[in-house]
A protein has these predicted regions:
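Juxtamembrane extracytoplasmic/periplasmic/luminal helical "stalk" adjacent to the first N-terminal
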Residues: 1-78, 85-96, 141, 154-158, ...
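Short N-terminal helix-loop-first-beta-strand/juxtamembrane motif that initiates sensory/input modules
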Residues: 38-53, 85-105, 140, 186-206, ...
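Cytosolic signal-transmission helices at domain junctions
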Residues: 11-19, 304-325
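Extracytoplasmic/periplasmic ligand-binding sensor regions of membrane-associated signaling proteins
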Residues: 79-81, 85-175, 238, 242-244
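Membrane-interface helix-start motif
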Residues: 10-13, 131, 181-185, 269-289
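Extreme N-terminal signal-anchor transmembrane helix of membrane signaling/transducer proteins, especially
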Residues: 1-11, 285-301
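PAS/LOV and related PAS-like sensory modules
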Residues: 20-27, 45, 190-191, 287, ...
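Extracellular/periplasmic juxtamembrane segments that couple receptor/chemosensory ectodomains to their
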Residues: 162-170, 190, 198-203, 211-286
Length: 325
């Protein structure tokens, strides 16, 4: 019965470890959903704002008439600069860009990175911002993270077309720093010394930084495990696998299921740490079993010895009685 009770206790502890990781996974998934859906909402609202459409029209007219360095253009730019700077500061963007439908970058909120260039034929025609611009001419679009020397961070883009009535004016782009997503993912409370949360893109590369690496792992570390393969096939689950550090881990995984992102989310902890309570219980059980075994052997030994002594004494008494007779 005690061993049966321990077996049930062991299974209950394992189930509790997995429940903890699954809860962390589901909470994190919700937070990531909220972050990206909020940014999707931001770009959608900005693109529909009449003030933005008016800004496109006025900036475009001045740009083509006087050039980006002309005082007339700079005067109109100064009207929209404070508003865009507010959006950047308040929402934590890296930048906001206005791009005409012909590919001319006519506004940059914080820096002049691409201003005045042509994203169809200019020096940045193969840049990520050119790619997102071309996609966003049709609909709201997302461009995955890539390294940006200007801000010394990985950045991603959301972009949407801007219309005035039925006429396409161009595309508005918001640039997102990776630091926001990294803050969400580096939450370690309740995950012990070896637990971590991380994202993997469909190209197999991490979209986050591992707590076990002193150098960035985003877009550098390749992860191909049973859990990531399951997640990219659409499965949600939790199991013990061989992790990307080549050791057994408890892994709770899920696809993100965002329309514009095909990533896998994983929450993991080393099996050795997760089952430490079980290991302690097993060690204690071994000690108890050893003590019980020693006591049992001692009991049998002394019982047999006492029984043998009693038999010897009985034989002596019997012999004495026969002699007296």
């Amino acid at each position: 019965v005690p061993f049966l009770s321990y077996s049930r206790y062991k299974e209950a502890l394992k189930a509790e470890c997995f429940r903890h990781l699954i809860t962390a996974r589901d909470v994190l998934k919700h937070e990531i959903w909220n972050y990206f859906n909020d940014r999707y909402g931001d770009i959608d609202v900005l693109s529909r704002n009449p003030v933005i459409a008016k800004g496109f029209t006025r900036l475009s007219g001045a740009f083509h008439a006087y050039g980006i360095d002309g005082p007339q253009f700079q005067k109109i730019r100064s009207i929209y600069q404070p508003l865009m700077e507010y959006y950047v500061a308040d929402y934590g963007y890296a930048n906001i860009f206005f791009i005409e439908r012909d590919g001319s970058v006519i506004f940059s909120a914080l820096r002049e990175d691409f201003s005045g260039t042509d994203l169809f034929i200019g020096e940045y025609k193969d840049h990520h911002i050119a790619h997102i611009f071309k996609l966003a001419l049709e609909d709201v679009s997302f461009e995955d993270y890539s390294w940006n020397d200007k801000v010394n961070d990985f950045t991603a883009y959301f972009a949407a077309p801007v219309f005035e009535a039925e006429s396409l004016l161009g595309v508005i782009v918001i640039e997102l720093p990776f630091s926001h997503l990294d803050t969400i993912l580096t939450h370690k409370a309740g995950l012990g010394k070896t637990g971590e949360m991380y994202l993997v893109g469909e190209d197999g590369l991490m979209r986050s930084n591992s707590r076990f690496s002193v150098t960035p792992t985003i877009l550098q570390k390749e992860v191909d495990t049973e859990a990531t393969r399951d997640a990219f096939e659409g499965y949600v689950g939790a199991k013990i696998i061989n992790g990307f550090r080549d050791m057994p881990v408890l892994s709770a995984y899920t696809p993100l299921n965002l329309n514009f992102i095909n990533w896998a989310l994983l929450v993991e902890m080393d099996e050795a740490e997760a089952f430490v309570a079980i290991q302690k219980a097993e060690s204690l059980l071994k000690v108890i079993a050893s003590v019980i075994g020693t006591i049992t052997i001692g009991y049998i030994y002394f019982t047999r010895r006492a029984y043998k002594k009693a038999e010897e004494e009985h034989d002596i008494l019997e012999s004495e009685e026969q002699s007296e007779a």
